[in-house]
Regions:
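Membrane-proximal intracellular helices of multi-pass ion channels
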Residues: 1-321
């Protein structure tokens, strides 16, 4: 019930703001009211479906402050997860928040602000994207929007086909990380990646425990994070390889990779090449979306029968790396 309450309240508040904006500022009349609530729900649920048509998304409104801020806020709120929202409601002070909430909020802040700076740096001199915008505010807002929308939202205010290859690859990394657990988004999840990074950093410095915010992460949780990362990576690489075969060299390899990761993280961003693939290619994308949405471990294990190992074998060390 709390999940439904949070979702309806957030969607109603931002939907009302957007409905009034579409109705008055964009002069769309009564149609704008429906459009406002549609886009609010679509953004909060990280769906990315828009009503502008022609695969334009929000590219015609990159300088609309109200629309951009509302959509970014909805994507972010929907992407941090209902568990964190409930924790924030109960505990207003940082010290009282659960470890999970601290990790999610920290990772989200790093991805948003760091992603904004990287995209701004990569696209600042590109005349087809940020370089062609009239003022600094528009450039910063567009860079921030692309960083946020990679959290599995699917909206865009820049034509992705005009972006540089380095920017698309960086967006692939952001999409692969995705949103947070119990959220409306997909991907490997922010907690998985942050735990992996901290664990790896600790191992490089000779530390056996993974510690975050003065709390030790259970070894079982760290192992699960490694398993999730490995299976997700293998799935995306496998889908990428198969789609390269289906594509037959028709499109750029980085475009194919972009579509695969976007599908796995259920982002919805695209560079317009999906309609060109045959039924096998589209089936691979569909399966990839299912695996990414319900969790690749859950998806794979649903086809396997787990058996308890009743035999415990002797251990032996091997050389790694």
């Amino acid at each position: 019930l709390n999940v439904v309450k949070y979702a309806l309240t957030i969607e109603f508040i931002f939907g009302t703001i957007l409905a009034w904006h579409f109705y008055s500022a964009l002069d769309m009349g009564l149609t704008g009211i429906a459009w406002g609530y549609w886009h609010a729900i679509s953004a909060f649920c990280n769906a990315g479906f828009d009503l502008f048509g022609d695969y334009a998304s929000l590219t015609g409104h990159y300088n609309d402050i109200t629309l951009n801020l509302c959509i970014m806020a909805l994507i972010t709120i929907g992407g941090i997860g209902f568990t964190v929202l409930d924790d924030l409601r109960r505990n207003r002070k940082w010290k009282k928040l659960r470890l999970h909430s601290k990790i999610v909020l920290t990772a989200s802040a790093i991805l948003t602000f760091g992603g904004t700076l990287v995209i701004l740096a990569l696209e600042y001199t590109n005349p087809a994207t940020l370089g062609g915008m009239p003022n600094e505010l528009d450039k910063w807002m567009a860079a921030a929007f692309q960083a946020v929308t990679c959290r599995t939202a699917g909206f865009n205010t820049i034509d992705l086909t005009d972006m540089r290859a380095s920017s698309l690859f960086f967006m692939v990394l952001l999409m692969g990380i995705g949103a947070s657990p119990t959220s409306t988004g997909g991907g490997m999840k922010t907690t998985t990646v942050l735990v992996l990074l901290v664990s790896t950093w600790g191992l490089l410095h000779g530390k056996r425990d993974t510690v975050l915010f003065d709390r030790r992460i259970a070894s079982e949780t760290v192992d699960k994070a490694y398993n999730v990362f490995t299976v997700c990576l293998l799935w995306m690489l496998g889908a990428y390889f198969l789609l390269l075969i289906c594509d037959g060299g028709l499109h750029r390899a980085d475009y194919v990779l972009f579509e695969v990761v976007s599908a796995f993280a259920t982002v919805g961003l695209g560079v317009g090449i999906t309609p060109d693939w045959n039924d096998w290619g589209k089936l691979i994308l569909v399966l990839t979306m299912y695996a990414g949405r319900i969790g690749v471990l859950t998806f794979v294990l649903s086809f396997l029968h787990s058996k308890d190992d009743k035999i415990r074998y002797p251990s032996e060390n091997i050389m790694i790396g």
